[in-house]
């Protein structure tokens, strides 16, 4: 039996990344959580941006847990701030890193499932430029596996290089979607790319 080569593409914090992109924000620098705040603070967060996760927030926690963790992180920032005072706030990670006197803030984006499906479909269309639909296994709205065994010779590329070519095509479309990928034939190699 011929050994098969697969590429796995996982759209990092997909719902949160889409919400950032739609606001003209960098998903790797924006504190944002996708949650239906109208349902109470016990609602489950559907996605959390990587920068917000860096404060110890779970990707699938409840909204009250996000608020509590941010409150705790702000208490630490206040303790360390000049004069033990926080003046203003920001939801941008880079701004918070530059100014320890600012409180951590974050955006709560209500979920828009139909829109995420549409967005995912547009990205899937990019995948189909390189791989036939019958060789793409859709695992979820934000994750696919591609059997690229028969395409490597055609494109004269390694699995990693083909994966990067596909990812760069997605990024070139100005979607600024952070992606993580795994590719290999018996091994996995990870690469991360942002904007």
Place the predicted regions along the sequence by residue.
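Gly/Gly-Pro- and Ser/Thr-rich, intrinsically disordered tail segments characteristic of DNA damage-repair
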Residues: 1-195
């Amino acid at each position: 039996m011929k050994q098969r080569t697969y590429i796995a593409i996982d759209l990092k914090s997909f719902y949160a990344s889409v919400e950032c992109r739609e606001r003209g924000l960098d998903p790797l620098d924006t504190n944002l959580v996708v949650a239906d705040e109208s349902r109470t603070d016990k609602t489950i967060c559907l996605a959390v941006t990587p920068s917000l996760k860096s404060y110890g927030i779970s990707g699938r926690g409840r909204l009250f847990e996000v608020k509590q963790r941010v409150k705790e992180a702000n208490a630490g920032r206040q303790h360390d701030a000049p004069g033990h005072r926080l003046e203003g706030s920001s939801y941008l990670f880079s701004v918070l890193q530059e100014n320890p006197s600012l409180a951590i803030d974050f955006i709560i984006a209500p979920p828009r499932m139909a829109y995420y499906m549409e967005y995912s479909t547009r990205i899937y269309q990019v995948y189909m430029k390189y791989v036939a639909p019958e060789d793409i296994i859709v695992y979820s709205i934000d994750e696919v596996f591609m059997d690229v065994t028969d395409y490597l010779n055609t494109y004269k590329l390694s699995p990693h290089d083909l994966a990067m070519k596909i990812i760069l095509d997605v990024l070139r479309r100005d979607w600024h979607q952070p992606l993580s990928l795994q590719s290999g034939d018996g091994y996995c190699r990870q690469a991360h790319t942002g904007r």
